[in-house]
Regions:
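Metal- or metallocofactor-binding catalytic centers and their adjacent structured scaffolds
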Residues: 37-126
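Structured beta-strand/loop patches that form or line metal/cofactor-binding pockets in enzymes
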Residues: 1-45, 49, 56
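Conserved small/polar residues in nucleotide/adenosyl-binding loops
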Residues: 202-204
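Short catalytic-loop micro-motif centered on adjacent basic/acidic residues
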Residues: 45, 190-193
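Active-site mouth loops of central-metabolism enzymes
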Residues: 143-175, 194-196
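Glycine-rich, aromatic-flanked loop segments that form ligand/cofactor-binding clefts
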Residues: 115-157
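Structural preference for beta-strand elements that scaffold enzyme active sites
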Residues: 33, 141-145, 187-191
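Alpha/beta enzyme core
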Residues: 172-188
Length: 204
């Protein structure tokens, strides 16, 4: 079984004006969908960052994957390392457009995107759940957790409309956000992305 085709599709979806230690989220989150197809018709999917520097690496890697056995993950890693090493000066000079996509993580980010797609293809070929290739399931279900952010009411620049969740810059507004998540979605676990504001006396 060999990889016959690789497609990298950039996507963008709306993101709220969420605050973090490095600033504010962009109006759109950029991701990429990776699809590999083998010469015997199996398909594997993965996903990763979708900013320009990340896409450049993904596009360069995909060209070298044709003919690779999707079970050959060491070969995949060697290809990714070679691509990143060849373009290291350009990667270091580029701006980080998506959190986590800077040059120091370029190998692991690109490798993991294609690794998941290869593992998916392996599982489909073997007709087993992917989790079985990773040692087996520990449990059948995992509950979702809510994620609270300090946030503005809307993105700073026009023409972006106000965010449906409203402003959350105070203790009361964060609590209201948590209650809304619980009431509308039934969350039982809630995490807070702190560190965006200097609220040393804040108690939640």
């Amino acid at each position: 079984m060999k990889i016959a085709r690789v497609t990298v599709t950039p996507i963008a979806f709306k993101d709220g004006p969420l605050l973090n230690a490095s600033g504010i989220h962009e109006p759109y989150a950029l991701r990429s969908i990776i699809e590999i197809e083998t010469d015997n018709g199996y398909i594997g999917l993965g996903e990763s960052y979708g900013d320009a520097p990340a896409l450049k690496i993904l596009d360069l890697v995909k060209e070298q994957l044709i003919g690779l056995d999707p079970f050959n993950l060491n070969g995949l890693r060697a290809i990714v390392r070679g691509v990143v090493a060849a373009m290291a000066p350009a990667s270091n000079a580029g701006a980080e457009l998506a959190p986590g996509s800077h040059a120091s993580k370029a190998v692991s980010n690109a490798y993991s995107a294609f690794e998941v797609a290869c593992l998916d293809a392996q599982a489909r070929y073997l007709n087993v759940p992917l989790v079985d290739l990773l040692g087996g399931a520990v449990r059948k279900e995992i509950p979702f957790s809510a994620y609270l952010f300090f946030k503005y009411a809307q993105h700073i620049d026009s023409p972006y409309a106000p965010d449906g969740w409203g402003e959350a810059l105070s203790e009361e507004q964060i609590v209201a956000q948590a209650r809304k998540m619980i009431e509308e979605n039934g969350f039982k676990s809630i995490k807070l992305k702190a560190g965006a504001l200097d609220l040393s006396l804040m108690h939640i």
